[in-house]
Amino acid sequence: RWYYHCDKLGIIVWQDMVNGGGAYPMWYVTYLTNALQPLMRRAPDGKLLWGFLGRGSVHSREEYARELADTVAALGRHPCIGCWVPFNEGWGQFDARKATETLRALDPSRPVDEASGWFDRGGGDVHSIHNYFYPLRIRPNVRTVVLSEYGGIAWPMPGHEPPRKTYGYGTARSRAELTERYCDLQRKTVLPQLKKGLSALVYTQLTDVEDEVNGLFTYDRTAIKPDAAAVRAVNEALEVEFEKAVKE
C-alpha cells in the first residue's frame, strides 16, 4: 500500500535492497570507515572485506541474490520506483559490480546507485556520497553525482521527543540555531557545488525517528522544527542555482 500511495502522489522512491548477512562490526563499517575516508573505502573488493561487511558465507551471498530478484519482481511494476540501490554504507555489501549487472539484466529501465555511501566501486549510474563531517568537494564524474546523505542536525523539540536515544550529526540548542545551521549548510556548503556537477540532494532527514532527532519534522509528525519560511527560501535559492547550472 505504501508504494501505491507513492505512485498516486508522484513520490519517487530510491529503493534499497534489504540489509542482510551476518553481524556488522560497527567499529569498522561506520567509525573507522568515516574516520579514515577515503582510504578505508578503497579496500579491495574481495572475500576479506566481505567478511567484515557481514557477507562471509556463500549461503548469505546466495540469499542476497534471491532477495534482489524477488524485490525487483515485487516492486518493479510500481512507477514510483526511480532507482535501485543494491547496497547502503557497506551493510552486507559484496561484489557490487555483479549486483549492478544483475539489476540491469532484470530491469534495464531504471538507474542503479551501486553503493550508496562508503565503498564505491565506480559502477552503476550514480556516484553516491554520504558526507556529514568533511569539506564537500565535488569532482567531474561520468556518473551522476549525488549527495545522498548529509546534514543530520539534531534538535529534540520539547514535548515531541521520540521514546529512545536522541542521536544526530551535531546538535542545535534551539529552533533558531537549527534554522541557522540548516540555511548555512545549504548556502555555504551545497550551493557552490552545483556548478561543479552536484545533481541531487538527500537531506538527513524528513522526520525524527526512534533513534535519531535530526528530522525537519517531529517524531509525531505534528510540528516542523526549523522555521518553515526560511527553509523554503533557501531551498528555492538552491533550485534557482541548479537551473542556472543546467543551462550552462
Where are each of the predicted segments found?
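Substrate-binding/catalytic cleft of secreted carbohydrate-active enzymes
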Residues: 1-222, 226-229, 235, 241-244
